UniProtKB/Swiss-Prot annotation:
GO biological process, one term: defense response
Subunit structure: Interacts with MED37E.
Subcellular location: Cytoplasm
Distribution of this protein across tissues and organs: Mostly present in shoots.
Protein name: Toll/interleukin-1 receptor-like protein
Role, per record: Disease resistance protein. Resistance proteins guard the plant against pathogens that contain an appropriate avirulence protein via a direct or indirect interaction with this avirulence protein. That triggers a defense system including the hypersensitive response, which restricts the pathogen growth.
Amino acid sequence: MSSHTATKYDVFLSFRGHDTRHNFISFLYKELVRRSIRTFKDDKELENGQRFSPELKSPIEVSRFAVVVVSENYAASSWCLDELVTIMDFEKKGSITVMPIFYGVEPNHVRWQTGVLAEQFKKHASREDPEKVLKWRQALTNFAQLSGDCSGDDDSKLVDKIANEISNKKTIYATI
């Protein structure tokens, strides 16, 4: 990872609140904080149709890792998709490491935007600028090509795995 603006957060959490805020994300956040991993989690409950806030670009920019939890309704949110475009732009520049988590969705469904994601993009296409929708699709495709983890029956094991991986990488970066 190339050097960039001073790191304020070790981790930026990107997730669809409706799907994961009160279960998986709350457990993951608690474990990261317990391990003294500085973590940014947007605690705002968003209204349907609310747009991505430019203020969120800053926490992304000053984070080492982005843990992106794509769940069934992630792509239904223009906010989440705008956030993902920003994250993937920083990833492309080498200024953030993206850790994909496929929560209750198959990576291939995300990569090819099939199944429920196809329906979500059909809705976006009817009300959004085609260029914006194309950016969202490309960001999701690029994201799904990264090596990541899939949720299973045991969220606690996945939480431990993610926290261990970040702790180990954080230690490596500290020695560079």
